[in-house]
Amino acid sequence: VLLILSDLIKVKGLIMKYRLLYLVLDGMADSINDEVTTLELADKPGLDELARKSICGLMYTVGKGIAPESDEAVISILGYDPHEVYTGRGPIEALGAGLNIREGYEVAFRANFATINPVTRKIIDRRVGRNLSTSEARELARALDNMEISIHQGYAKVVATIGHRAVVVIGSRTRKLSPMVSNNDPAYQRKGLVSIAVENPKPYVEPITPLDNSEESKAAAEIANAFFEKAVEILDKHPVNIKRVENKLLPANALLLRDAGGSIPKATPLGVKYNCRFSLLAEMPVEIGIGRAFGAEVIPLEPPTGDPRVDYEKRLNTTLKALEKHDVVYVHLKGPDEPGHDGKPELKKQKIEEIDKYYVQPLLSYLDKYAIIVTADHATPPSKKTHTDDPVPILFYMPGLLPDNIEKFTEKNCMRGSLGILEHGWLLLPTIIEKYLKN
């Protein structure tokens, strides 16, 4: 996460000297128990130079023992306790995709187009080999959108977002529904409204079940399961999938559902919380939805072109323009997370190096103007192929600040920094503001 602070920002009556750029490198961290981490292997002179001029530390982005999903982690590092405000990932993704939820009668899920054996329900690939194009996904979603479901006068709305990702909203015209239902995606286990990443999950679709004894939860589970079955029938015969199979590609013949929610989070907006003009730059629906839900001015980033130089130069230019108009600019860069999930350490290393070369290094020429924090929303070690509960590194730079003399920006080096170890991500901004930025 990269934080840039500028002239005379008032936060809770305090005066901050600098505008704030808050840059999150999604899934950048690995496990502190790994023999060697991606940050240790990466050639990243920009981040290392920042580290040498900064104070450093580690942070559990939600809490010890919690391997967070991205949404609850981002909510936390923005300064909110997700246990108090979180309503499930589904509504946040829906908001990011432009869908509104009819509270009480609709439940939103984050969904993955996936490949399954339609007879045994064995999951072959949770993400369709990561090669489902957004245009293919949108065509498949159109075949499912506005589906009528016979039970409880139900219906479903389906929107494809980016790649294999989608949002599914189920509803009933006659029954109230509750989001207290399980996931059918075995990679994430529901605990209340929060999902926890599961190491080595069983590769089978699980029926969605109510998490309490209410009729509303039972009805929601029944509609969701009926939607899943009908979706498999439609998708398995869809021309997009027939063509994919002919081309020796995996078919996107199922939707894995997780993280149900029935309402948008209600919390003090970011601009009010920090008494500043707060903007958020992101490309993924989940971060866009968080920005909208928590009152930031959202600046959507263009989808990646595949050319990292072009992509990160555009993102940096957008960042600098946003800093001309806003006191705090949160920037979320996705790069390192996917190769972590896919168990590809060399590709994760490459993604970090690309961000360093084309985004961070050019940013160094602005060190006289800004203070900077760099961190991650969670760890995604290639050794585990999932989010883990490991703490993530933080660096904080501000002109005139006495540095910790950390030579390289890595998990183990940051452990020795003067920021110490923050037990919760929601402590980061208040700590920095109170301890270092107040005049």
Task: Give the positions of each predicted feature.
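Feature captures the catalytic ectodomains and active-site-proximal regions of enzymes
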Residues: I4-N439
